[in-house]
Design a protein with these regions (language model features):
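Bacterial N-terminal signal peptides
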Residues: 9-20
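Beta-rich interaction/scaffold domains
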Residues: 25-127, 849-1005
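Short proline/glycine-enriched turn/loop motifs at strand-loop junctions of beta-rich domains
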Residues: 56, 681, 690-696
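Aromatic (Trp/Tyr) and acidic
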Residues: 132-222, 260-284, 298-343, 347-358, ...
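Helix-terminus loop motifs that line ligand-binding clefts
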Residues: 225-309, 504-516
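Hydrophobic, small-residue-rich alpha-helical packing segments that form membrane-like cores
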Residues: 344-350, 369-472, 479-483
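C-terminal beta-rich recognition modules with glycine/proline-rich loops and embedded aromatic residues
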Residues: 493, 572-581, 586, 592-666, ...
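Solvent-exposed beta-strand/loop surfaces of large extracellular or lumenal domains
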Residues: 695-720, 740-747
């Protein structure tokens, strides 16, 4: 979703594009002496690749060292250039029977300058990918069936979340609906944040609020459940009251007024999107169509059919995104309330509470009814008023309203959240065959062919897209596979997830910068060139890059993929990493505040805030995250229990209580069973995850005896089906081990201080110290010049200190020591911390130098730059600009042209007249220009030239400010943040200037 907190695309001003003359030569800390460990062998990679697809290559390889130690290592494959992938996906160029090799490198290794060389042998074959059946092989236990126990960081965060939810004003969550549907608003608090009167995303926060209430209800104690239930019941009842106002019978049509009837095409083409029009649309709720429920008028999803751009003042924000949040909230209420038996019982003499005091099942049924009616509104609108046209140019595809190919390919405006997921889930929940079919059909109306088709063939079309706009679309596609059985949707999700793991994820599991994916394998460049400016246009490093919503949605996608293939431990390995690090660490442990962009890198400090679900998108996912930690702890089918996460819990399943006793985080866990059958036994198999990091000392004991001699990290170990009794005990021993999560690209430059945005460094691998599943960070390193170390090949210079006492949130605190510095888990940190270090792992000899001059990397970067120039030139040549905005914003584009010209000059030099250092610097500078460009509809810092002096003067030179001026300054500050972050639009700047000018004029200034 559109960002409203500090984060930045990493855009640099042209004046700051100069490079220092000499690279920083940093002192390195010597490694401990001893025999050097080197890679001895790497598992062979040989894949059959269905014709018309790009080979699926693993993102990590099982690696054996000279001393016998083994572990998983990350790999970078050298076929990631888009043109290369497109060629490999061509059946003409790569026909059945062709065999070829893809080169790759184990990253972080110094055998060569690029890493340890590996290769994949690929054979093109006929047929399709093998896919699992279109049904879950295992399902997570219902949220209400699992309860986190003890006093630890998990329960601390959960309780803080529930307390926050109970403190929120439910009337504020209902205000916009009553306002939109013409109901009285007296006694209702006006909404704020992104649900405020000046935003067009109203309703998104209420949707998150409903989901959070449901999850909290499943996780809370009895007393809290009573209070949560009152809120759930009230919000469901009042939303139905609003929805019923759209049930309008039309005697001429002899049916209810439907979604398809709203705004016929001629009228639609004339509709405006400004605030005056918005206020008029609110008066027309009788014509929204049967079942429409949203906090914004039906005009806004209709305007998307005319390809109206993201522009909060003049057009739309993301109307289907808001619809999704509300659908999801209602579905979550229906599911949870349907799972938890109970009825509200008012004690004698107790005052009447709002609501009718339905049973839980009645509340669930009403929530489902509301969601179903809204889902069928979506089906009706998209079925009758939209279509898909994929051929022709953009102008031809947009010649007629309603082309979904174009609608869902728009930046932000076309953001639909998890519409497909919610509609597919609704299809599973309703019983009427016609309604089931229509809801499933509606789910696939949110297919995005421009994005889906390449990724389904394993072509990485993820690059440069808006991250959180697209992750939920993949989750929805996967969910629809259950109903439609089309392998296309499973393959799409499988490919997407694996591309993310290898090419885009950071150590904590998060992704993106400025809400965007950059080029594949460029995480370190993106992190190190991310900057922000102050009001005087001074530029500073900005580590706030990984949007927390992305972590939320990647966890959800991972959980669903695991349901189809629960024996693939890689899914829960990743889930554990993103949960234990970014998600758990995204809330302040002492007072409620969650992160929007998660801080990553050098001297990073988490920007806690977003105190309400409506404050921002991440404020919304934030209230959900911390009341559902247990949702993927256990998976089950008829005969098997998968223990996927090791956390202190009690769970109910199959006539038994499952108790897992451990600390959190856990190096040891004990699992027992308490059957409540007449016989005192219950039969099933148990599968326990061996985490990817469990490379030393891992063991599983059943009643005191080890069940295996060896265990393969990143796998499951099965205890076959047996009769379990209360006397049985499973012990899992899993000592946390040290390892490195490496960035895939070497660091050769970074923003290092005020107006030092591109300080050069000697190229070096960058990595994060991991302690078991935990990302470790230190508050003791603040600058890159102090962050370069030589590391012993066997990590003997890393001291694992184990767990100490209470860390302030009642959990044991794991620490490690390295190079004289203390490291603590990232989730624990609330101050400044450094996650990544420049690490030189000692080798048996110097890295093998490149033979002669190698221009291949520069050549590839130039090709990417030329693709962008071609797209810009094609748009420039259009007589009628469709879309209205250019592909790339002008200042960033000009920087690209400048760096491209310089790079081509270097490329043209004879190999005898150029050095490798010169080539590498040219490639790096051009790569920065590519990775810091913005879409053409977004403002750039240069566009603040009128606003910045005005707001600075208003702050510094006008005493005794009026309320109007203070509010105008606050608004201007927000806009400056948005633009510097890479998320602001020109209309916001214009509005900020006008507000300041008017406020100053009213003061006589």
């Amino acid at each position: 979703m559109k960002s409203r907190k500090l984060f930045f695309c990493g855009l640099m001003l042209a004046a700051m594009n100069c490079m220092c003359l000499a690279a920083n030569v940093l002192p390195s800390v010597p490694a401990a002496k001893g025999k050097v460990r080197v890679i001895k062998a790497v598992e062979a990679v040989a894949v059959d690749c269905p014709v018309g697809t790009v080979p699926r290559l693993p993102y990590q390889l099982w690696t054996t060292y000279s001393d016998g130690y083994k572990e998983w290592r990350q790999v970078r494959w050298m076929n990631a250039l888009l043109s290369t992938e497109q060629q490999q996906a061509s059946a003409e160029l790569y026909p059945v029977g062709r065999e070829y090799t893809v080169k790759g490198y184990i990253i972080g290794d110094n055998t060569t300058e690029n890493g340890y060389p590996v290769e994949a042998k690929v054979r093109v074959v006929a047929g399709e990918y093998a896919t699992p059946a279109n049904r879950f092989k295992a399902q997570p236990l219902p949220l209400a069936s699992v309860h986190i126990t003890g006093e630890n960081r998990l329960t601390n965060n959960r309780d803080l979340d529930i307390k926050t939810l109970l403190a929120l004003d439910v009337t504020q969550q209902l205000y916009n609906y009553r306002d939109t549907y013409g109901l009285p608003t007296e006694g209702y608090t006006v909404a704020d944040g992104w649900d405020s009167p000046t935003t067009k995303l109203k309703g998104h926060g209420t949707g998150h609020y409903m989901s959070a209430l449901a999850f909290a209800y499943a996780s809370a104690d009895f007393k809290q459940r009573v209070e949560l239930r009152n809120r759930i019941e009230r919000i469901v009842n009042e939303l139905r009251e609003c929805q019923e106002r759209t049930f309008v019978w039309d005697s001429t049509l002899n049916r209810y007024w439907e979604a398809r009837d709203y705004a016929p095409e001629g009228e639609l083409l004339q509709m405006k999107g400004n605030w005056a029009a918005f206020d008029e649309y609110k008066k027309d709720y009788r014509h929204y169509g049967y079942g429409y429920l949203n906090a914004i008028p039906a005009a806004h999803p209709a305007l998307i059919e005319c390809y109206r751009a993201y522009n909060n003042e003049d057009w739309v924000w993301a109307p289907y995104y808001t619809i999704h949040k509300q659908l999801a909230g209602l579905i979550d209420i229906a599911n949870v309330m349907g799972e938890v038996p109970g009825i509200y019982l008012r004690k004698q003499g107790e005052p009447e509470q709002p609501g009718s005091h339905f049973s839980n099942n009645e509340i669930a049924a009403k929530a489902l009814l509301i969601a179903k009616d809204m889902g069928l509104w979506v089906w009706n609108r998209l079925h009758y008023r939209t279509y898909v046209k994929t051929d022709g140019d953009k102008a031809e595809r947009q010649a007629k309203p309603g082309n979904r190919y174009e609608m869902w390919n728009m930046y932000i405006a076309g953001e639909v959240g998890g519409m497909a997921e919610s509609l597919a889930r609704l299809s599973e929940m309703v019983s009427d065959p016609t309604e089931k079919a229509r809801l499933l059909e509606a789910a696939n109306y949110f297919d995005a062919p421009a994005f889906f088709d390449p990724v389904a063939r394993n072509v990485d079309d993820i690059r440069t897209r808006h991250a959180n706009q697209h992750i939920p679309m993949i989750t929805g596609a996967l969910r629809s596979y259950i109903g439609n059985g089309n392998p296309y949707y499973y393959n799409l999700a499988y490919n997407f997830w694996n591309l993310i793991q290898g090419r885009y994820a950071y150590a904590m599991g998060g992704v993106g910068n400025g809400e965007m994916w950059r080029q594949p394998y460029s995480q370190m460049l993106s992190m190190n060139t991310s900057v922000m400016s102050d009001h005087h246009r001074n530029m500073y490093p900005n580590p706030d890059i990984n949007e927390t919503c992305c972590a939320y949605n990647l966890a959800k996608l991972t959980k669903d993929l695991n349901c189809f293939d629960p024996d693939n431990a890689a899914y829960m390995d990743y889930y554990e990493r993103v949960l234990y690090n970014q998600i758990v660490g995204s809330v302040h442990p002492e007072h409620w505040g969650v992160t929007y962009q998660y801080a990553v890198g050098m001297n990073a400090r988490k920007p806690f805030g977003n105190e309400t679900p409506q404050s921002t998108c991440c404020g919304g996912t934030g209230v959900e995250n911390h009341v559902k930690y247990q949702e993927a702890a256990y998976f089950v089918n008829d005969n098997t229990l998968w223990v996927a996460l090791y956390m202190p819990t009690t769970a109910r399943w199959k006539e038994t209580v499952i108790k897992q006793e451990c600390e959190w985080p856990a190096e040891k866990s004990t699992i027992t069973f308490n059957p409540f059958t007449e016989a005192g036994t219950v039969a099933f198999a148990v599968k326990l995850r061996v985490p990817y990091w469990a490379t030393k000392g891992f063991d599983i004991k059943l009643n005191g005896k080890s069940i295996a001699k060896t265990y393969q990290p990143s796998s499951y170990v099965e205890i076959p089906k047996r009769e379990w009794t209360e006397n049985d005990k499973i012990e899992v021993i899993m000592p946390f081990t040290a390892h490195i999560n490496w960035g895939p690209d070497k660091m050769d430059l970074a923003a290092t201080g005020k107006n030092e945005t591109r300080t050069p460094f000697n190229p070096q691998w960058v990595g994060t110290l991991m302690y078991g599943p935990l990302v470790m960070a230190t508050p003791e390193i603040h600058e890159w010049k102090d962050a370069e170390f030589t590391l012993a090949s066997n990590f003997s210079d890393i001291t694992l200190n184990g767990a100490t006492g209470d860390d302030g949130t009642r959990s044991p605190l794991y620490t490690l020591s390295f190079a004289g510095h203390q490291f603590q888990p990232d989730y624990y940190q609330t101050g400044n911390e450094t996650h990544y270090l420049r690490l030189n792992v000692e080798t048996a000899g110097k890295a093998k130098a490149k033979k002669g001059i190698d221009k291949s990397n520069l050549e590839q970067v130039i090709e990417v730059a030329k693709e962008r120039v071609d797209s810009q030139n094609a748009w420039n040549a259009l007589a009628v600009k469709v879309p209205a905005f250019s592909p790339w914003a002008p200042n960033g584009y000009q920087r690209l042209l400048n760096q491209l010209k310089a790079a081509e000059t270097v490329m043209a030099k004879d190999k005898k007249a150029v050095t490798q250092e010169e080539i590498d610097k040219a490639a790096s500078a051009l790569n920065v220009a590519i990775n810091t460009m913005r879409p053409g509809n977004l403002a750039e810092p240069e566009d603040l030239n009128e606003l910045l002096p005005l707001v600075t003067d208003s702050k510094e030179n006008i005493p005794n400010k009026t309320t109007e001026l203070r509010e105008a300054i606050n608004y201007a500050d927000m806009v400056v943040q948005y633009v510097n972050d890479g998320s602001g639009t020109h209309d916001l700047i214009e509005k900020a200037v006008k507000r300041l000018q008017q406020a100053r004029k009213n003061m006589g200034k």
